Amino acid sequence: MKQKVSVPFMLLGILFNVCLIAANLLETKVIQIGSLTVTAGLLVFPISYIINDCIAEVWGFKKARLIIWSGFAMNFFVVALGLIAVAIPAAPFWEGEEHFDFVFGMAPRIVAASLMAFLVGSFLNAYVMSKMKVASRGRHFSARAILSTLVGETADSLIFFPVAFGGIIAWRELLIMMCIQIILKSMYEVIILPVTIRVVKAIKKIDGSDVYDTCLLYTSPS
């Protein structure tokens, strides 16, 4: 029996992957927001958590898990291609090699930290969203979205910064950076929440899906 792919699900999945890849590339630039110094990935990475919330809310944990693994695979693929391109000698007349290498030749330690943090944070976000939906019988979406994002973003930052920069940046500075990232990413979720609510309602109406993960074995691959 053929499985029909939902158009809204497919579009959100594509956007999820685009946001993750863009965030990894933007992470190479450090930007200033007022007195705060953050990476440019902050501009787009929180959107992946918002999409994760939408997918877990509408289609359940299994579909969220599928999208998370696809995001991991696409990120790994892009990183691998980037490292291969960096390793291939550039044309003698090309002057942009140094800048290209800076963007795509990310240190293996940072790449590993990013992929590890993404997996743990995203799965925690989807898990909390799924469990709270069942416990609340589908009510209080706003609270569930904010709390699940806070849990996921906290786990992401607690893994990424120590693994990527431990021993390079002072631990006090790392702690400050982690707190800033967690707070700003969570604020991002709160600010865009009215849009998220409308999108979820529209998708449920169009797609006719509203999955509750009752009695779901979360560790099962199927």
Spans of features found by a protein language model:
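Alpha-helical transmembrane segments and their lipid-water interface positions
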Residues: E27, V78-V86, G121, N125, ...
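Membrane-interface interhelical connector segments
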Residues: A85-M106
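Hydrophobic transmembrane alpha-helices
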Residues: M1-F72, F76
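Internal alpha-helical transmembrane segments of multi-pass membrane proteins
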Residues: A135-T154
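Membrane-embedded alpha-helical bundles of multi-pass transporters/translocases
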Residues: M74, E97, R109-G121, M132-S136, ...
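A structural feature that tracks compact, well-ordered secondary-structure segments
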Residues: T149, F160-G166
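Residue-level signature of transmembrane alpha-helical entry/exit and packing/kink sites
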Residues: P8-G13, V38-G41, M106, I110, ...
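Conserved small/polar residues in nucleotide/adenosyl-binding loops
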Residues: Y218-S222
